[in-house]
Amino acid sequence: MSLIVLLSGPNLNLLGEREPAIYGTGTLADHVARAELAAAHRGLALEHFQSNHEGELIDAVHAARGRAAALVINAGALSHTSWSLHDAVAAFDGPTVELHLSNPAAREPFRHTSVLAPVAAGVIAGFGGLGYELAVDAVAQLLKGAS
């Protein structure tokens, strides 16, 4: 069974409490459960890791190399600033889908550019919690095409 590693970045542990008008009322646990269910329906395993620390996320990407078939990453604001995370994702040997609950292009200008997008197979943004299911589906399709 292929493994997807789902990574959640800074402040995502506060989902459901922090800015619900932007991020919705669903908690991170709600979104992870939705992703796990979507993965199970597609015959995939899913492992989740959340950290508020850039280095820990980089370590998680490194640990996924050779073990996971794909990454789904919601790096939060690190998506716009972390060249180190960009480099780690670039070194990962499977498809990566970048995920955002909100649509960064419709928000503040500093959110309009993602440093992860150039090393991701695709970006899913603006669909709220549904994005987690869409990201797993995208990864499943990418893995299917790779086999």
Describe every region a protein language model picked out.
Residues M1-I4:
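Extreme N-terminal starter segment of soluble prokaryotic enzymes
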Residues L15-D30:
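Glycine- and acidic-residue-enriched helix-capping/strand-helix junction motifs
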Residues A45-G55:
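Short beta->alpha junction loops
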Residues E47-H48, V97, A106-S147:
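Short, glycine-/small-residue-rich phosphate/pyrophosphate-handling segment
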Residues E56-L71:
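Short, electropositive alpha-helical surface patch
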Residues A64-G66, A90-A91, T113-P118:
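Short, hinge-like loop/turn segments at secondary-structure boundaries
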Residues A68-A105:
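Mid-chain, well-packed structural core segment of small domains
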